[in-house]
Amino acid sequence: MIFEDIKEFGEEMRLFHSQVNYRLYYSLGCHLVEKEGKKGAEFKVWAPNAKDVQLVGNFNNWDGSKHRMFFNGYHGVWSIFVPDIKEGEVYKYKITSKKNEVFLKADPFAFYSELRPGTASIVKDVTKPYNWEDDKWINKRGEWNPFENPINIYEVHLGSWRRKPESEIKKIDKPDLEKTQQELKDESGFLDYKEICDKLLPYVLEMGYTHIEIMPLSEHPLDGSWGYQSVGYYSMTSRYGDPEGFKYLVNEFHKAGIGVILDWVPGHFCKDAHGLLKFDGTPLYEYPDEWRSENKGWGTANFNLASPEVRSFLISNAVFLFDIYHIDGIRADAVSNIIYLEYGQPEVRGLKNKYGGDEDIEAIEFLKLLNEIVFSKFKNPLMIAEEATAWPLVTKPAYVGGLGFNYKWNMGWMNDMLKYMEMDPIYRQYHHNLVTFSLMYCFSENYILSLSHDEVVHGKKSILDKMFGNYEDKFASLRMFLGYMFGHPGKKLNFMGTEIGQFMEWRFYEELEWKMLKYPKHDSIKRYVKDLNALYKKERSLWEQDITFEGFKWIDHSNYQESIISFVRKSKDEKDFLLFVCNFTPVPHFNYLVGSEYLVDYEEIFNSDRDIYSGTNILNSGIIQPKLQDRNGIPYSIELNIPPLSTIILKPKFKDEKKETETIKKKITITNLNTSK
């Protein structure tokens, strides 16, 4: 063991050990530097309990004796400067534990990694200046109120949205471990970040989404984990190219006015041998107690969120993604698994904290700190929790007892509504509460209504195929359901494929069923979603008061016998509202009365049953005049045709009082002139 005192390194490491170094990516890992006139790379790795650490790679024929690292015992950090190292060199740390076990570990702070099944880190400088052209977007985001603006998210898995045609995929007849990195890329079928961007961005703009949410891009060994079992938190996966490619993608999306959100997994990590597990022979990143470190549900290891160093590692990673890659938001995965000791682990029972509860106190404090730091460093980021329980105040600040996120997925709404839509309409009248219950709590948090990737895998069927009924009914139900979803309070998220009516479940290893668009029903559902997205963006009443009861009012929630609901969505202007009527059965209704708070004309501006959407074209044409007839305790009403399995949207046509006054004045003037003659 070679000792070295790195004095200039001391303050950074003191902050690291105190959980307040949130820019660790500048301190640890590999950085291209110049020392004493020599250009090369400096490597630093935290392995406080190791007996010896050596740097190995192609540059020394993987012979670590040539590059034994120096140990700073006070901070537990090993370091070495190697001249003439350039970008593209592969490396690992050869770590000998105090039990004389030898591990070859990837760099936890590596900015780039080999494509699987390769596991080495690659020297890459992602902190060097990049020609960003998104100042306009970043400045706009700084002034943007996320609660009073449209958020309509398209969730994407980059490896399966589009893939290379079979004709362009090279098949190489030798074992994977014998293939070069280029050969692995050539036969993977993946598009690179630039190719994906150049196809995905025009599509997102065409369809009218406001944001994309990308499933995890941190480096991971197994395609089938979808990125949720990571080993390289600072390394954008090499499946789709290099870090500059991802910067290009973000830059282009921002220039076009589209936000970029990343899925992020702060609770657990992959247990592959080259990763974080027992990094220096001891549980460094995971909990020391097996009952806490083992995540038996996913076969992963839980991060030790009580550790100051692990907190610094993870919070620095979140900051890194905003700082280096200019992302706009993070969706924290599996927050319920983080905040509860026993969540999702039925074989584990009786785990209690020091107060006798099942809350993970240290993990909760970590989440509060994470959000506090991100919000203090970046203007108006989206910090979204995937949290599936009734834990209170998830989207409230830590200073009032909250976790500090600004949005969470509304898992209750999703579960209730998918259960309802899978049900035979004959029986829906007995389960009407599944439609109405969400309005009892939907303003208790800031919600995103999510129909995510999790709902279209593992035998659950696609969103379209979940819909009850025959072929025609499934499409009608999907249109109705999405229309209802866009009327319900909360921002929106849909997983790729829903917008084209994909019948098959999502498969991570092949692209979406784009071929289905040659069939009219699928093409028309795409048009429907595009038009619905455009309406959502245009109408302030659908997003300006999303988190308050001021933006919603029931017209009729009690017609369970016919499974019809009606409600109003309002903007801050009391005369700017939309009236929604949703029919959850295949029975049409004619001359159906719907209550109106105002004695005002209406116009139908959207109807999921239009023939251009492959519907039956039961419409409400022209001006719909009100009646002086009470309905559901509301003084006025309008008479409508309600198509089967439909959502219709109506807008009031208030008279322009200023224009009316001017018209009256003109008439008076003309009358006076005629009289004087």
Where are these regions (language model features)?
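Conserved, mostly hydrophobic/aromatic
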Residues: V45, Y93, V156, V204, ...
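Short proline/glycine-enriched turn/loop motifs at strand-loop junctions of beta-rich domains
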Residues: W46-V53, E597-V600
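Short, surface-exposed loop motifs enriched in S/T, G, D/E and P with embedded aromatic residues
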Residues: S65-G73
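C-terminal beta-strand-rich structural cap/linker in extracellular carbohydrate-active enzymes
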Residues: E87-Y91, S621-E662
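Substrate-binding/active-site clefts of carbohydrate-active enzymes
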Residues: E114, P129, W137-E148, H157-E359
